[in-house]
């Protein structure tokens, strides 16, 4: 396959092992080459049984976990929170407040700066697995 991406929306109590397995599955589909984390929410989802706001730092942790497992890009949905339909309850980089003076925006800005600094060392990296898991 030329391009592999996936959307990661774990619950706030998700196991880091399950998340790692999902990233590894995507990397495996690309023969060990990097994949793209196409969507994750910077704050809350609108469809979990409990839509808790992510604790400070958790979005950064999960983003670095994706990079450590082979993601060349870590993206977020959505940029600006919707004003209608069900996605008005889904988190966004810019909340209904309409400005960047929020914890979520500041955390994302910091994450972007950090990833920019390490990008030359992480983009395109490959990791050869020492074991295999049959996933059927």
Feature map (PLM): residue ranges:
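Carbohydrate-binding surfaces of carbohydrate-active enzymes
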Residues: 2-136
């Amino acid at each position: 396959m030329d391009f592999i991406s996936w959307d990661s929306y774990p619950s706030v109590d998700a196991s880091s092992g399950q998340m790692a397995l999902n990233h590894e599955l995507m990397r495996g589909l690309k023969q060990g080459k990097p994949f793209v984390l196409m969507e994750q929410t910077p704050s809350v989802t609108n469809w979990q049984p409990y839509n808790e706001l992510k604790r400070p730092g958790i979005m950064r942790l999960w983003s670095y976990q994706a990079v450590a497992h082979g993601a060349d890009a870590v993206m977020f949905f959505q940029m600006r929170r919707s004003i209608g339909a069900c996605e008005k309850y889904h988190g966004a980089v810019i909340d209904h407040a309409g400005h960047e003076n929020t914890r979520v925006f500041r955390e994302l800005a910091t994450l972007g700066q950090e990833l920019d600094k390490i990008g030359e060392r992480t983009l395109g990296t490959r990791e050869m697995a020492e074991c295999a898991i049959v996933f059927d």
